C-alpha cells in the first residue's frame, strides 16, 4: 500500500492498472470516422448528380 492506503497494481512492464491506454481509443475513433467519410462521399456523389432532387427530398422529410 502507498501512503494514502490505496493499492496500485502493475502488469510487470511498468504500467499500472489506473492509467488509460491512449492507443485503444484512437483506434476506435478511426473506425467511426471511416463510416462518416463513406456517408459524406455518398452525399457528395448524390449532390453532384442531382442536387435539386436531393434538396426536394430533404425538404419533404421535414428539413428546413
From Swiss-Prot:
<comment type="function">
    <text>Protein modifier that is covalently attached to lysine residues of substrate proteins, thereby targeting them for proteasomal degradation. The tagging system is termed pupylation.</text>
</comment>
<feature type="compositionally biased region" description="Polar residues">
    <location>
        <begin position="1"/>
        <end position="10"/>
    </location>
</feature>
<keyword id="KW-1017">Isopeptide bond</keyword>
<dbReference type="InterPro" id="IPR008515">
    <property type="entry name" value="Ubiquitin-like_Pup"/>
</dbReference>
<feature type="cross-link" description="Isoglutamyl lysine isopeptide (Gln-Lys) (interchain with K-? in acceptor proteins)">
    <location>
        <position position="64"/>
    </location>
</feature>
<protein>
    <recommendedName>
        <fullName>Prokaryotic ubiquitin-like protein Pup</fullName>
    </recommendedName>
</protein>
<feature type="region of interest" description="Disordered">
    <location>
        <begin position="1"/>
        <end position="32"/>
    </location>
</feature>
<dbReference type="GO" id="GO:0031386">
    <property type="term" value="F:protein tag activity"/>
</dbReference>
<feature type="region of interest" description="ARC ATPase binding">
    <location>
        <begin position="20"/>
        <end position="58"/>
    </location>
</feature>
<dbReference type="GO" id="GO:0070628">
    <property type="term" value="F:proteasome binding"/>
</dbReference>
<feature type="modified residue" description="Deamidated glutamine">
    <location>
        <position position="64"/>
    </location>
</feature>
<comment type="subunit">
    <text>Strongly interacts with the proteasome-associated ATPase ARC through a hydrophobic interface; the interacting region of Pup lies in its C-terminal half. There is one Pup binding site per ARC hexamer ring.</text>
</comment>
<dbReference type="Pfam" id="PF05639">
    <property type="entry name" value="Pup"/>
</dbReference>
<dbReference type="GO" id="GO:0070490">
    <property type="term" value="P:protein pupylation"/>
</dbReference>
<dbReference type="GO" id="GO:0010498">
    <property type="term" value="P:proteasomal protein catabolic process"/>
</dbReference>
<comment type="similarity">
    <text>Belongs to the prokaryotic ubiquitin-like protein family.</text>
</comment>
<dbReference type="GO" id="GO:0019941">
    <property type="term" value="P:modification-dependent protein catabolic process"/>
</dbReference>
<keyword id="KW-0833">Ubl conjugation pathway</keyword>
<comment type="pathway">
    <text>Protein degradation; proteasomal Pup-dependent pathway.</text>
</comment>
